[in-house]
């Protein structure tokens, strides 16, 4: 019996169904952790809980040689690049690592590197910060990184901070570019499957005209590419405007700080925003309890709807401006 390649709607529906079941599994894991370990431990380990939930899901399905619930839902099966054999155990393990472990560790280590650079640039170690809570038990690698960062000049540190930020944005850009390519070519929906060469075959014949569906998705891919180019141009202009606004804001802060009373100055030395690394102005709280400048956090929320420190997801409407906060 000859099998044909899975079409784009099947791959998308399969991924969406898997995400739905993974979200349900994560929610149950969060509830169990909160019930037994408390809210404090849950806040500290919630990213790791999500990681282990995803690993459990894929180990019980893909790694064990079974279809995921999403794949079973649309009647597709995994095959290797030859489309004649099922993926080997090594390929399945590599797929799970690239799909779950790699994004987690990449995001975690980049955030940590960015935080280290900001601390060194500022010259103050925030011992109570959520991101530096494990600084006293650093691994040998991070001790080496810390020594190398300490040896850099201030200008080099600032340049490296920008480079890390651009690299993180480039990862998001690459994902969107890959998605647009999928709409046009229809080969791999996830980057991890492209790296491991895992394809899909459909068990049953799909209902509908594949050529008509493919033309529709090709048009969607072209529109996505155009939108991505426009977004890149807008972000570049926005980045330049932010740089100019940041310089003006630093001048205004310096003038305000020089006019402040001595007792207010001594307090403000401790109250600094971790985004701009300047004295915190117009203090604003996120739902998770972290404090930032109003201008800094609202600007951050224009591109990312998450806390810069703990990565808790929230909408900009949830920000609380703390009037007369001392």
Swiss-Prot record:
UniProt xrefs under CDD domains: RING-HC_PEX10
Single GO molecular function: zinc ion binding
UniProt source species: Xenopus laevis
Metabolic or biological pathway, per its Swiss-Prot or TrEMBL entry: Protein modification; protein ubiquitination
Enzyme class label: transferase
Known partners and oligomeric status: Component of the PEX2-PEX10-PEX12 retrotranslocation channel.
Protein task: E3 ubiquitin-protein ligase component of a retrotranslocation channel required for peroxisome organization by mediating export of the PEX5 receptor from peroxisomes to the cytosol, thereby promoting PEX5 recycling. The retrotranslocation channel is composed of PEX2, PEX10 and PEX12; each subunit contributing transmembrane segments that coassemble into an open channel that specifically allows the passage of PEX5 through the peroxisomal membrane. PEX10 also regulates PEX5 recycling by acting as a E3 ubiquitin-protein ligase.
Record GO cellular component, one term: peroxisomal membrane
Family affiliation: Belongs to the pex2/pex10/pex12 family.
Protein name per Swiss-Prot or TrEMBL: Peroxisome assembly protein 10-B
SUPFAM superfamilies: RING/U-box (SSF57850)
InterPro entries (UniProt xref): PEX2/10, Pex_N, Znf_RING, Znf_RING/FYVE/PHD, Znf_RING_CS
Catalytic activity: S-ubiquitinyl-[E2 ubiquitin-conjugating enzyme]-L-cysteine + [acceptor protein]-L-lysine = [E2 ubiquitin-conjugating enzyme]-L-cysteine + N(6)-ubiquitinyl-[acceptor protein]-L-lysine
Residues annotated as binding Zn(2+) 2: 288, 290, 307, 310
Activation/inhibition comment: The E3 ubiquitin-protein ligase activity is stimulated by PEX12.
Residues reported in the UniProt entry to bind Zn(2+) 1: 273, 276, 293, 296
């Amino acid at each position: 019996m000859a099998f044909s390649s899975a079409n784009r709607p099947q791959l998308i529906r399969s991924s969406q169904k898997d995400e739905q079941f993974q979200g349900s599994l994560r929610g149950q894991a969060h509830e169990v952790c909160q019930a037994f370990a408390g809210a404090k431990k849950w806040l500290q380990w919630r990213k790791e809980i999500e990681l282990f939930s995803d690993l459990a899901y894929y180990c019980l399905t893909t790694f064990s040689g079974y279809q995921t619930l999403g794949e079973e839902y649309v009647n597709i099966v995994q095959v290797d690049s030859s489309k004649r054999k099922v993926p080997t155990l090594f390929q399945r393990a590599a797929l799970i690592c690239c799909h779950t472990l790699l994004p987690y560790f990449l995001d975690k280590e980049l955030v940590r590197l960015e935080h280290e650079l900001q601390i060194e640039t500022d010259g103050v170690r925030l011992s109570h910060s959520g991101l530096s809570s494990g600084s006293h038990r650093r691994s040998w690698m991070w001790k080496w990184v810390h020594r190398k960062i300490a040896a850099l000049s201030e200008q080099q540190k600032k340049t490296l901070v920008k480079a890390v930020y651009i690299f993180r944005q480039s990862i998001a850009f690459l994902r969107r570019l890959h998605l647009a390519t999928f709409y046009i070519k229809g080969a791999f929906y996830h980057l991890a499957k492209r790296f491991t060469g895992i394809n899909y075959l459909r068990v049953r014949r799909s209902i509908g005209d594949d050529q008509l569906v493919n033309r529709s998705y090709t048009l969607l891919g072209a529109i996505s590419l155009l939108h991505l180019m426009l977004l890149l141009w807008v972000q570049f202009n926005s980045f330049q405007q932010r740089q100019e606004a940041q310089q003006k804001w630093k001048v205004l802060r310096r003038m305000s700080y020089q006019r402040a009373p001595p007792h207010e100055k001594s307090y403000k030395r401790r109250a600094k925003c971790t985004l701009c690394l300047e004295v915190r102005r117009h203090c604003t709280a996120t739902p998770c309890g972290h404090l930032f400048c109003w201008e800094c956090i609202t600007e951050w929320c224009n591109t990312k709807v998450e806390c810069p420190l703990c990565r808790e997801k929230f909408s900009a409407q949830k920000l609380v401006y703390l009037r007369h906060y001392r």
